[in-house]
Curated annotation (Swiss-Prot):
This is Bifunctional protein FolD. The lineage of its organism: Bacteria, Pseudomonadati, Pseudomonadota, Alphaproteobacteria, Hyphomicrobiales. Belongs to the tetrahydrofolate dehydrogenase/cyclohydrolase family. It comes from Rhodopseudomonas palustris (strain HaA2). Homodimer. GO terms for cellular component: cytosol. PROSITE patterns: THF_DHG_CYH_1 (PS00766). Keywords: Amino-acid biosynthesis, Histidine biosynthesis, Hydrolase, Methionine biosynthesis, Multifunctional enzyme, NADP, One-carbon metabolism, Oxidoreductase, Purine biosynthesis.
Amino acid sequence: MTATIIDGKIISAELRARVAAEVTRIKADHGITPGLAVVLVGSDPASEVYVRSKHKQTQEAGMASFEHRLPADVPQAELLALIGQLNADPAVHGILVQLPLPKGLDSNAVIDAIDPAKDVDGLNPVNAGRLASGLFALTPCTPLGCIIMAKQVHASLEGMNAIVIGRSNLVGKPLVQLLLNENATVTIAHSRSRDLPALCRQADLVFAAVGRPEMVKGDWIKPGATVIDVGINRTPSPDGGKDKLVGDVAFAEAKDIAGAITPVPGGVGLMTVACLLVNTVRAASAIHGLPKPAV
């Protein structure tokens, strides 16, 4: 058996098209243009790439895009003052501070300062608490993308056995909550879990988010299971050429056992920015008291 490839390029393009249609409708019906503000501190090359991609895709969806660039040595008070201005700006419905921040800045204080209604990264403790309580919340983008990809394979996740490998605040913990909201039966595994391969072999859905190259081996996978690989790891090429990107799952082994699997690259990573656009439209609708959009 060779697994069906869950193509992030196709799914994210379809999602962005649906977002653009919702933006057009909201503009026409209510005269509102959803706006996303991205704050970049310093000049980390990887962050620069992400910010450019977000700016381009935001504009392509018909939304307003605001970029704020600050030097790496910006005082914490100045960064917090900018966030305060964005919180008060009616043209801004979503605020994203590109992480990680340079040394010397308190990321937790910055996240706490973002208005939860505009927290499109879903990291503010208020949104985390609302998600855990089953209330409407802006959800971290990568876990949201994982659920969308899993539901491309399974119309319903209800009753399925799922394992989430990794317990970060950014991916693992919110993903567990989203799976519970879908009525899946969830195991959360981590570095202290005993006999991780055996736990994986019981799962219909495997979500790998540990940041360890190809840790999940093919023989850990239950035949026919759906595998969502969140990992993006840069590893040296065996022939000494350019580094290659691999996931947390040993793809070459797993694809012959799984029923469906996401590739790396070309999988979950492409969904993250698309889900950021989803969150911005949802935030704009909620702020203006509009019904939840159809994305």
